[in-house]
Design a protein with these regions (language model features):
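Acidic, metal-coordinating catalytic segment for phosphate/diphosphate chemistry
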Residues: 11-47
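Generic secondary-structure boundary/loop-capping signal
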Residues: 32, 41, 66, 141-143, ...
C-alpha cells in the first residue's frame, strides 16, 4: 500500500489524529514535493516510538535543536515508504542494531509545527512536519550511541518518565502521552 492507502486504512485515535490525517491526505494530493524538503511549507517526516520487548521502557534522544528529550525520527528526503525512514532514523540516531516494527501499520499521525531555526549555518523558516509514527521494538541491552550533529543523549525511560523528561509542552501533553495511552491498549 502507498501512504495514501495506509492513511485511509488507518483509524484515528482521537480528534487530533482525525484532523491531522485529513490535512496530510489533502497535502499529499495538493502540495508538490511533500516527500522532500524542497517544499518549504510542509513535508513528510517519520517518527519512531521505540519500546523494549516487555513495553516497560521507551527510547528517547536529547534533541539538540529542541533542547528536549524526544522521540527519534526524521525527514522522508524522497523516500515514500515512511516505515523505512523510521527504521533508518532509529538506527542512525541511537546506534541500535536490533530494531524492528511491532506492527507495519501506522501507529500515529501528527501535523507538527516547527519554529524557524538555524541548521548547519542556514536559516530554516517555520514549517509543518506531516508526520507518521511507527511503533518499533528494540533490544534494551544493545549499546547506544549519540549522533552528535543531532542529539547529545540517548536513554531508555519508563513510559511516564519519557513524558516527564520532555520540555516541550505540546509534545509531552498531546503526543507522547497519546502514544503511551495507545501502548497500554495493545
Amino acid at each position: 500500500m502507498n501512504l495514501e492507502q495506509q492513511l485511509l486504512a488507518y483509524t484515528p485515535y482521537n480528534e487530533q489524529e482525525a484532523r491531522d490525517r485529513e490535512l496530510i491526505l489533502r497535502c499529499l494530493k495538493d502540495e508538490p514535493d511533500v516527500f522532500t524538503r524542497r517544499n518549504e511549507l510542509v513535508h513528510m517526516t517519520a517518527s519512531a516510538w521505540i519500546v523494549n520487548a516487555d513495553r516497560t521502557k521507551v527510547l528517547m534522544a536529547y534533541h539538540n535543536l529542541y533542547q528536549s528529550w524526544a522521540w527519534l525520527g526524521g525527514h522522508a528526503d524522497g523516500e515514500t515508504d515512511l516505515l523505512v525512514v523510521a527504521l533508518k532514523e532509529a538506527r542512525e540516531e541511537s546506534g541500535l542494531a536490533h530494531v524492528r516494527p511491532v506492527m507495519e501499520e501506522i501507529y500515529s499521525v501528527e501535523a507538527l509545527h516547527v519554529c524557524g531555526h538555524v541548521k548547519r549555518g542556514q536559516y530554516v523558516s517555520s514549517h509543518i512536519h506531516l508526520n507518521v509514527t511507527y511503533l518499533l521494538e528494540a533490544d534494551e541491552n544493545d549499546p547506544l550511541f549519540i549522533k552528535a550533529d543531532e542529539n547529545s543523549g540517548v536513554a531508555w525511560f519508563a513510559p511516564k518518565e519519557a513524558e516527564d523528561v520532555c520540555t516541550e509542552p505540546w509534545m509531552r501533553d498531546h503526543i507522547y502521552r497519546k502514544l503511551n495511552e495507545k501502548l497500554r491498549t495493545l
